[in-house]
């Protein structure tokens, strides 16, 4: 499935739900004349990634320009974040879970129509996939998507109305249903509907869903971004483990410069460099819990084998 197909597929999935609207917060300007300020509006599970990346980029930017740069981060469900920009959040860049969400901002006249071509790999500097996070020992013996529709299995996943990760979760389940039922759409719909009947909590974003499962102890299985699941296991290796479904989906988060805002803010060059540097060797090593696009960096990354990408 190429990027354009994914955009259409996610748009179709999103159309099944009532669109949620979340308001956002505005930004800045730097009081210090020698300091550039950027606002990066991003999706939920990228907090740690951009905390580390921003530190590296600040050093790089200082070396290249002689100027200091301050980066303001905003995180939340990808759909809600896109709408916050449309409604007035003065983001310089967006780094969102779905190309579809950036397309919404583009259609609002804030991003150039050729944004997909502005950066390599269709403006997708890293990828991920969807896995299951279960409690240690896997007490419900969850091994594949089929197990999520069994009676008594309590599933946690975010809300597709506001979360990009939730849309990828939906598409992963749909892909499994299509293969299992030989592309029978009605049977696939019934399968996915049965899965969502077992969902007890739908938070607005992926990080909220992780908190519900990991910290609040709710649910038997969390459908999660791979990098989010890896972080949970790293932090509590005796409490959780990852289950790899037989079929998943290659999730491609996207990035773009908010051209209308950077023109007003005078930050166009800094914003472009901020996103371009995500493709550097140094940044690709930081993105180690995502599926980086640099082959050398990927060699040292904690990667898990997958089947059934499309």
Report each predicted region and the residues it spans.
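Short helix-loop capping/hinge motifs at secondary-structure junctions, enriched
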Residues: 137-143, 162, 175-183, 261-269
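Periplasmic-binding protein-like
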Residues: 124-129, 192-196, 203, 235-263, ...
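Sec-exported extracytoplasmic/periplasmic mature domains
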Residues: 54-63, 86-90, 99, 106-110, ...
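N-terminal segment of the mature folded domain
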Residues: 31-162, 302-305
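Extracellular/periplasmic juxtamembrane helices and adjacent flexible linkers that interface
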Residues: 262-310
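Short beta-strand->loop
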Residues: 41-43, 134-136, 154-181, 196-199, ...
